[in-house]
């Protein structure tokens, strides 16, 4: 499980699905980040009253991640209907890749070669070295500066 912070989540707002943006409107950035980190990809049913015990203890699960007020706000908003906590795959992948590249740069700063760094970091980040090389190449290509004489020639 990849945990994400509210600041990181805010950085990738454009990649979030509408359902995540709705949760942000109800709960705010910090609570939504905690909710996605804990339950992303799961459908929960927050029934209240007599049917609460049939919900599988969702209220208890929510309170393990959200404050009492946040949990109540979410339950009020949903009205007891089942709800899907989005995984936010694209946003999480973007954050993971940024973390990976940052740590790769740090490893190289300590004297490790790229290949040594990849051997250490790829398993930790759950990516293959081929994917890592693609990330490195994409970053390199995005940082290349156009020649001043070529700027705007074909744009």
Kindly give the residue locations of the regions a language model identified.
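A general alpha-helix detector
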Residues: 15-22, 57-61, 117-120
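DNA major-groove recognition helix of helix-turn-helix
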Residues: 136-139
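Basic, amphipathic alpha-helix used for nucleic-acid engagement in HTH/winged-helix/SANT-Myb modules
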Residues: 13-16, 68-93
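Short, amphipathic alpha-helical "recognition" segments used to contact nucleic acids or chromatin
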Residues: 93-115
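Short Lys/Arg-enriched helix C-cap and helix-to-coil transition segments
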Residues: 143-155
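DNA-contacting interfaces and partner/effector-binding or oligomerization modules
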Residues: 1-53, 72, 80
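Acidic (E/D-rich), amphipathic helical modules within compact regulatory domains
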Residues: 53-71
